[in-house]
């Protein structure tokens, strides 16, 4: 187990934090792409201004 001195304020080690960040970012990019495409499609269909 990691020493308390190895843990950040989140309770994760540096390696765990980097792994969590990479998983989060790998999900964020596809979500953002789908959101942008959806907004463009709705704007083309029915502009809101």
Swiss-Prot record:
Main location: membrane
Keywords for the protein's UniProt record, in alphabetical order: Antenna complex, Bacteriochlorophyll, Cell inner membrane, Cell membrane, Chlorophyll, Chromophore, Light-harvesting polypeptide, Magnesium, Membrane, Metal-binding, Signal-anchor, Transmembrane, Transmembrane helix
Record has Magnesium as a keyword: yes
GO biological process: photosynthesis, light reaction
A GO cellular component entry from the record: plasma membrane light-harvesting complex
UniProt-listed InterPro entries: Antenna_a/b, Antenna_beta_CS, Antenna_beta_dom_sf, LHB-1/5, Light-harvesting_complex
Membrane topology: Single-pass type II membrane protein
Stretches of the chain found on the membrane's Cytoplasmic side: 2-27
GO MF annotation, one: electron transporter, transferring electrons within the cyclic electron transport pathway of photosynthesis activity
Pfam family, one: LHC
NCBIfam families cross-referenced by the UniProt entry: pufB_517_ASD
Annotated function: Antenna complexes are light-harvesting systems, which transfer the excitation energy to the reaction centers.
Quaternary state and interactors: The core complex is formed by different alpha and beta chains, binding bacteriochlorophyll molecules, and arranged most probably in tetrameric structures disposed around the reaction center. The non-pigmented gamma chains may constitute additional components.
Name of the protein in its database record: Light-harvesting protein B-875 beta chain
Organism: Cereibacter sphaeroides
Gene assigned in the entry: pufB
